């Protein structure tokens, strides 16, 4: 009854109007699972390969018909007959079938679609919510949201260098209240920007994308919005930044070209800059503060700020246990961003989260800039008790879908639901 009898993929669209892969899995007993694969704008060079067709006559070369074909003609025959609850076995079979270190043959978008759809079908088969199926009865922690309310960098068409400026409503007693706080600050920010005569259009992840004079000014207007909403910055709400510095790192000069600031900085100068910002603003999290290959710079940043600021490796670690193990060994950063499509299977995703926790690193489950209505990452965050989630702003249905799923989960958990807020940053000295 739990045997997989059919796997089917199709080409659908993501939140940017670009093609992506959707996969459906069916079992002998009638269980069903469906999953859609996200896509990133700023991608690390060590990420698993997202297979695109390259045919300029279709979707500007971004079609995924080859990935769809790989599911339907190569992966499906391999996993039909598997028990749907054998997640690790199915993921391992697909990894071996691909045979490359970066899933470049079949495509991480093909493999991940199947991996997630299998999990959904298995949860349907056993009659459990996905978070409970994946995490067991210990799955009860709702994540602290990192809400991206100002977009810059490659996520927006403006002159702000840093890619994301986030609010973290750590002072809320429940996840439900954290969402309310975030929404109120978001709407207050819209009013602040409007009063300043600034653009209130939103970027890929639902945050505003105004032309501001500097990265510092972005932090200043967020503080103003927090206060306008009736909250205290540094108490109720903290700040976070995804710098995505690889996007403006100049490999030829070895410097960081911040066009919005009108400056080029060395690694040491960037660390000085972050230290200065952290003194002036209640910043609790910095992601990809230096280039993914600037390990010496990351080491310096960790030495200077690692005890009081969460330093998240995204492009640095790419949800890869080998990269993370190297970072842990060298004492670089203290947190990892978890993106399922960076590594390509749920099994490997869970292994990365487990490795991080064993080493005392935090794990932040994350969306991508090209998202869909699929809310699997919400269930993953609760299943693993990750403690933090980064899934965009308080606008755009592709972002809100994850928050709404978490609200449902909190409601379902009832009295056993846990929202740790500031405690989810367990490796920082408060």
Curated annotation (Swiss-Prot):
Q: Which InterPro entries match?
A: Enolase, Enolase-like_C_sf, Enolase-like_N, Enolase_C, Enolase_CS, Enolase_N
Q: How is the cofactor bound?
A: Binds a second Mg(2+) ion via substrate during catalysis.
Q: Which domain of life is it from?
A: Bacteria
Which residues act catalytically here? 205, 339
EC number, as in UniProt: 4.2.1.11
The residues the record assigns to binding (2R)-2-phosphoglycerate are: 163, 339, 368-369, 390
- Involved pathway(s): Carbohydrate degradation; glycolysis; pyruvate from D-glyceraldehyde 3-phosphate: step 4/5
Query: So what does this thing catalyse?
Result: (2R)-2-phosphoglycerate = phosphoenolpyruvate + H2O
* Residues binding Mg(2+): 242, 287, 314
Cellular-component GO terms for this entry: cell surface; extracellular region; phosphopyruvate hydratase complex
Its Gene Ontology molecular function terms? magnesium ion binding; phosphopyruvate hydratase activity
Q: For this entry, list what GO says about its biological process.
A: glycolytic process
Principal localization? cytoplasm
Q: What cofactors does this protein use?
A: Mg(2+)
Q: Which family does it belong to?
A: Belongs to the enolase family.
Q: What does this protein do?
A: Catalyzes the reversible conversion of 2-phosphoglycerate (2-PG) into phosphoenolpyruvate (PEP). It is essential for the degradation of carbohydrates via glycolysis.
Task: Tell me which HAMAP family the record gives.
Answer: Enolase
Name-wise, this protein is Enolase
Query: Which gene is this protein's source?
Result: eno
């Amino acid at each position: 009854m739990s045997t997989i009898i059919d796997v089917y993929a199709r080409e659908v669209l993501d939140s940017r109007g670009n093609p992506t892969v959707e996969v459906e899995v069916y079992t002998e007993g009638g269980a069903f699972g469906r999953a859609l694969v996200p896509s990133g704008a700023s991608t690390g060079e060590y990420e698993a390969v997202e297979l695109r067709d390259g045919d300029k006559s279709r979707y500007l070369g971004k079609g995924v018909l080859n990935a769809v074909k790989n599911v339907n003609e190569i992966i499906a025959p391999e996993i039909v007959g598997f028990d749907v609850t054998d997640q690790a076995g199915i993921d391992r079979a697909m990894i071996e079938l691909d045979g490359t270190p970066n899933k470049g043959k079949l495509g991480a978008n093909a493999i991940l679609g199947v991996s997630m759809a299998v999990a959904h079908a298995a949860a349907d088969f056993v009659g459990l919510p996905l978070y409970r199926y994946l995490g067991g009865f210990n799955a009860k922690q709702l994540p602290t949201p990192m809400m991206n309310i100002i977009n810059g960098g490659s996520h927006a068409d403006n002159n702000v260098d840093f890619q994301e400026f986030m609010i973290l409503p750590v002072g809320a007693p429940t996840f439900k209240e954290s969402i309310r706080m975030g929404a109120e600050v978001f709407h207050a920010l819209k009013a602040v920007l409007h009063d300043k005569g600034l653009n209130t259009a939103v970027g890929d992840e639902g945050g505003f994308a105004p032309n501001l004079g500097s990265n510092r000014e972005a932090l200043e207007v967020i503080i103003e919005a927090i206060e306008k909403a009736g909250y205290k910055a540094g108490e109720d709400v903290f700040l976070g930044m995804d710098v995505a510095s690889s996007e403006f790192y100049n490999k030829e000069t070895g410097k960081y070209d911040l066009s919005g600031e009108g400056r080029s900085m060395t690694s040491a100068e960037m660390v000085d800059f972050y230290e200065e910002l952290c003194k002036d603003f209640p910043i609790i999290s910095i992601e990809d503060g230096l280039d993914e290959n600037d390990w010496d710079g990351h080491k310096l940043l960790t030495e200077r700020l690692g005890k009081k600021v969460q330093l998240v490796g995204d492009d640095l670690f790419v949800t890869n246990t080998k990269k993370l193990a190297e970072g842990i060994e060298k004492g670089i950063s203290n947190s990892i961003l978890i993106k399922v499509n960076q590594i390509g299977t749920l099994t490997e995703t869970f292994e990365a989260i487990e490795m991080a926790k064993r080493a005392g690193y935090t794990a932040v489950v994350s969306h991508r800039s090209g998202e869909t209505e699929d809310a699997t990452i919400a269930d993953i965050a609760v299943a693993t008790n990750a403690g933090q989630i980064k899934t965009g702003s308080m606008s755009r249905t592709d972002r809100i879908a994850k928050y709404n799923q978490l609200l449902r989960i909190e409601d379902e958990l009832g009295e056993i639901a846990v929202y740790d807020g500031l405690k989810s940053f367990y490796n920082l000295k408060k």
